[in-house]
């Protein structure tokens, strides 16, 4: 006699009542973030698990491979959220639809044979070692797949080396080889014709050597450092509005791109402060600079955690950063088969 089990739900909602939130939120913060455990220098070296949202994401996956959505009172429009109810409803609907295996929208201008990769790093505590870092790749395809690949941990001395990077060509080659393997599994064993790698820090020689080795058979390759804090500003002469969204100025392998700004179709600038452009530096550039800018513009429209017109940073960078925060939770360290779909982390 066979055992019949119910399939997992597409999504599990976890509502937090106002009373629970009031009892558990951080009394030293004006936000509604729930206090899981107060961070101290000692605890940070031992157990990097302080974010309730991240801990719940890990728990939902570990105990049933569940996709979850935490619902706080502000999610339903209670309190001063700064958003109207229609915007809140749209954001909630878009996020829920994606988590329940839907694709809210696609962009036709993204090339079907291009693989977009965002690299990030996060802190991992394992076997009492607090000096470990791990690389993480967010892989995005035109069809809407948004996948996560975790690299191998490596030792890192932040006091002497600053921001993490892949310290050997082997580490760099390994994670990009895994990216290509993922692409081939989803594309009937076909390689991508073009691979674009985005990082929020400069590419090091060790990384470039390893990436080039892993991508030796790929026709077109671009390595782009995306700097969000360059301090550069452009001011149109005699104009009341800031530069138009999409303004792109380049020279050689460097460029400035406004992913936010005045939108002629809406006849307004939707921000409240002077927009800041992204500063781009290509460490390898097989594609025309205009194509690199167009890719980034398109990837700012694919954050399915809300229904916003666009975000300032492309999803290759923003999603990699968010997923890295969750992967650093100590309760995930004993999970070998961690989820690859972004739905589990959002």
PLM features: residue spans?
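Long, contiguous domain-sized segments
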Residues: 1-346
């Amino acid at each position: 006699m066979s055992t019949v089990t119910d399939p997992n739900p597409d999504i599990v909602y976890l509502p937090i009542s106002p009373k629970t939130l009031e009892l558990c939120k951080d009394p030293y913060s004006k936000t509604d973030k729930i206090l899981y455990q107060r961070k101290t220098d000692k605890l940070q070296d031992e157990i990097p698990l302080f974010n309730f949202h991240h801990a719940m994401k890990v728990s939902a996956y570990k105990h049933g491979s569940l996709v979850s959505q935490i619902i706080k009172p502000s999610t339903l429009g209670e309190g001063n959220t700064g958003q109207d109810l229609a915007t809140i409803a749209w954001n909630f609907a878009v996020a829920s639809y994606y988590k329940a295996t839907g694709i809210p929208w696609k962009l036709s201008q993204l090339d079907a044979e291009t693989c977009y990769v965002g690299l990030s790093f996060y802190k991992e505590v394992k076997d009492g070692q607090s000096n470990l870092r791990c690389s993480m790749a967010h892989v995005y395809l035109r069809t809407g797949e948004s996948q996560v690949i975790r690299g191998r941990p490596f030792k890192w001395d932040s006091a002497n080396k600053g921001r993490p990077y892949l310290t050997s060509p082997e580490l760099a080659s390994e994670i990009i080889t895994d990216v290509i393997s993922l692409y081939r599994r989803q594309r009937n064993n076909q390689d991508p014709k073009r691979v674009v790698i985005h990082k929020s820090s400069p590419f090091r020689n060790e990384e470039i050597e390893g990436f080039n080795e892993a991508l030796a058979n790929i026709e077109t390759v671009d390595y782009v450092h995306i700097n969000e804090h360059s301090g550069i500003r452009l001011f149109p002469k005699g104009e009341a509005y800031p530069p138009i969204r999409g303004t792109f100025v380049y020279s050689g392998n460097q460029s400035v791109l406004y992913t936010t700004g005045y939108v002629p179709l809406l006849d307004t600038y939707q921000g409240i402060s002077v927009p800041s452009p992204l500063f781009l530096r290509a460490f390898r550039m097989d594609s025309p600079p205009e194509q690199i800018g167009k890719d980034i513009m398109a990837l700012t429209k694919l954050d399915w955690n809300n229904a916003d017109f666009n975000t300032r940073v492309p999803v290759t960078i923003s999603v990699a950063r968010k997923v890295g925060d969750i992967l650093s939770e100590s309760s995930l360290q004993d999970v070998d088969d961690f989820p690859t779909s972004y739905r589990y982390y959002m």
